[in-house]
Regions:
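P-loop NTP-binding/switch modules centered on Walker-like glycine-rich loops
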Residues: 22, 36, 156, 160-241, ...
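Helix-to-loop junction immediately C-terminal to a conserved catalytic motif
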Residues: 35, 361
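Conserved ABC transporter NBD signature motif
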Residues: 43-54, 369-377, 386
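ABC ATPase NBD coupling module
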Residues: 54-68, 86, 94, 215-221, ...
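Conserved ABC ATPase "signature" region
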Residues: 102-121, 230, 424-441, 550
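Charged, flexible cofactor/metal-binding loops and thiol motifs
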Residues: 120, 213-314, 533-617
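A short, proline-enriched helix->beta-strand linker immediately N-terminal to the Walker B motif
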Residues: 145-149, 465-469
């Protein structure tokens, strides 16, 4: 397998280079090659150097000293059995040869530099006691311990919600300025690349297809692949169907001597099978038809229709409450979802979104409050009829699908459970695979033989097997590449339109909500703070928390004024009063902490929960 093929890039002192592309494009392989961590793989390069030193021979000596690295999942980076303090101090003890006292003192200072409050206290904590954003800051502190000149960042914010992600990006910008750091940032989020990078290199199936200044490449993309990535990107300022890139990456065991994007390119023509080198000086592109297609738009699919506001109510919650010990995970939530409607639910990690979704399905018992489905009250132990009509699609298909069962067995179980197959299970499985745009042959495949997007399609097919009226989608696209994500989102919109499904779509990606949802509810500390039509809420947010969330979303080509919230992410005011009072930048006085805020109508169907009059927001 030739994972990288004639890839050239350089990172200038104090600059940031972005590497973008789908999973399998070679981004992480490039990072591991620079670190000398590819094991037995053969690395051939005309030149691979850092400050004049040959990385083919010196990478192990430079790694952890002059070159630092931060990876995607801090939970796998950090040792769960060792305190944070010892892990941050370790590179100082091993590489800098400091005494334990000096290393401990510097490690505490590093945690403070990465924006962690109470750094001295955190030194004694274990990783499981920290949030995802805090763990990533610890990983950054470890990478900075030996004062590296180059920091390699492999998807450092992928698993984080939008405000935590914005905080990490602010931190990286500050570190680059203070320490004159050079950064190599790998990400599939083009908004992050646009915000943080000076230059960008686009990789496809191991080859560079476009490279140049980030503003030029993202504002005037010239290669069809880059244009396809941008067309598939969910944006706050754009609604309607997304335009996923058709097909899949080529087989790297059989490299195509010509354009390897040709089978997926809507602009491919005779001659594209010939080899082509990068052309251009400052803005380089590898495409035979770059001038011919400059004025052609990327094909856009038709938008699916949205639900009618006159549709009947399907699901209604009234005052749902769920506590875990002293934590009020869901606190008095009342919502309505109509037939065929998509309600988006957004908020930071830990705000209660997933708990609310499970309460709506009676997968968790509510401490109080009522749930009605199709006008009938749903008991704590629901009947099989409710289970058939209300289903869920989970975030991670790797844990949701049984690795020992093939796709046919996975789909057959709900058919038998609800007595729907009636002796025609094979035909019904074929119908379900067709619904989610998978070929019939996939029935014999096992989960490990599927891509991430294909696994999620199987998860959706399983939810559809019982012919439900309502599905909870709990972060179903958060782990997917932008193009695969676009295809899954379009599929859900299509299924909603053709089958009349109602969806509760839970996500921390507000751009995704903008494309799929009819209405959106914003959640914080177990309560809904704002609710209304998605176009209205996202274009004219009234609640201070919603405004802060939207300001944190990185948007290609836009520079919104960031509203930085004080306090720790997810800090909740206990007892009576506004849950957001501890972090609210517009807090008006003691009333915010001493009285529950009222619901106020900002417009027909658009309401907020706040003490501040709507005309002042």
């Amino acid at each position: 397998v030739r994972a990288l093929d004639n890839v050239d890039f350089a990172v200038a002192p104090g600059a940031t280079l972005g590497l973008v592309g789908e999973s399998g494009s070679g981004k992480s392989t490039a990072v591991l090659a620079l670190l000398g961590l590819l094991g037995g793989a053969q690395v051939a390069a005309r030149r691979m150097a850092f400050d004049g030193q040959d990385l083919l021979t010196t990478a192990p000596a430079l790694r952890g000293r002059r070159i630092g690295a931060v990876f995607q999942d801090p939970s796998s980076t950090l040792n769960p059995a060792v305190t944070v303090g010892l892990q941050v101090a370790e590179p100082l003890l091993v590489h800098a040869r400091l005494s334990r006292t000096e290393a401990w003192s510097q490690a505490t200072a590093l945690l403070a530099e990465t924006g962690l409050a109470r750094s001295a206290t955190l030194m004694a904590c274990y990783p499981h006691q920290l949030s995802g954003g805090m763990k990533q800051r610890v990983a950054i502190a470890m990478a900075l311990a030996t004062r590296p000149e180059l920091l390699l960042l492999d998807e450092p914010t992928t698993a984080l919600d939008v405000t935590v992600e914005a905080g990490i990006l602010d931190l990286l910008e500050g570190l680059r300025a203070r320490r004159a750091l050079s950064l190599l940032l790998v990400s599939h989020n083009l908004g992050i690349i646009d915000r943080l990078c000076d230059r960008v290199t686009v990789l496809y199936a191991g080859r560079m297809v476009e490279a140049g200044p980030v503003r030029a490449v993202l504002a005037r993309a010239r290669h069809p692949y880059t244009r396809g990535l941008l067309a598939a990107l969910p944006r706050l300022d754009r609604r309607g169907a997304l335009a996923p890139i058709p097909g899949a990456l080529p087989d790297l065991r059989q490299p195509d001597p010509g354009c390897n994007f040709r089978p997926r390119c809507p602009f491919a023509a005779a001659g594209c099978e010939r080899p082509r080198a990068l052309a251009g000086e400052e803005h380089q592109v590898r495409c035979h038809r770059v001038e011919e297609i400059a004025s052609l738009a990327w094909p856009s699919p038709p938008s699916a229709p949205h639900a009618s506001s006159a549709a009947a109510t399907l699901l209604q919650t009234d005052g749902l409450v769920r506590r875990f010990g002293t934590v009020r995970a869901v606190d008095g939530v009342s919502l309505t979802i109509r037939r065929g409607e998509v309600l988006g639910l957004v908020g930071e990690s830990g705000c209660g979104k997933s708990t609310l979704g499970r309460l709506m399905l009676r997968l968790l018992d509510a401490d109080s409050g009522t749930l009605h489905f199709d006008t009938a009250a749903v008991p704590k132990i629901p009947l099989a009829a409710f289970r058939r009509r209300a289903q869920i699609v989970f975030q991670n298909p790797d844990t949701a699908l049984n690795p020992r069962q093939n796709v046919a067995t996975i789909l057959r179980r709900p058919l038998h459970r609800f007595a729907l197959a009636r002796g025609a299970a094979v035909e019904e499985i074929a119908r379900l695979l067709e619904l989610v745009r998978l070929p019939p042959s996939y029935a014999a495949r096992y989960p490990h033989q599927l891509s991430g997007g294909e696994k999620q399609r199987v998860g959706i097919a399983r939810a559809l097997a019982s012919r439900p009226d309502f599905i909870v989608c709990d972060e179903p696209v958060s782990a997917l590449d932008v193009s695969v994500q676009a295809a899954v989102l379009n599929l859900l919109a299509e299924l909603r339109a053709t089958l009349g499904l109602a969806l509760l779509f839970i996500s921390h990606d507000i751009g995704v909500i903008a494309h799929l949802a009819d209405r959106v509810a914003v959640m914080y500390g177990g309560q809904i703070l704002e609710e209304g039509p998605v176009a209205m809420v996202l274009s004219s947010p009234h609640h201070p928390y919603t405004a802060a969330l939207l300001s944190a979303v990185p948007v290609v080509g836009a520079r919104p004024t960031r509203q930085i919230l004080p306090g720790d992410s997810g800090a909740v005011h206990g007892g009576i009063g506004c849950r957001f009072a501890l972090r609210c930048p517009q807090r008006i006085g003691p009333i915010c902490a001493e009285a529950d805020p009222p619901w106020r109508d900002a417009a027909p169907g658009h309401r907020i929960r706040c003490h501040i009059p709507t005309e002042q927001l």
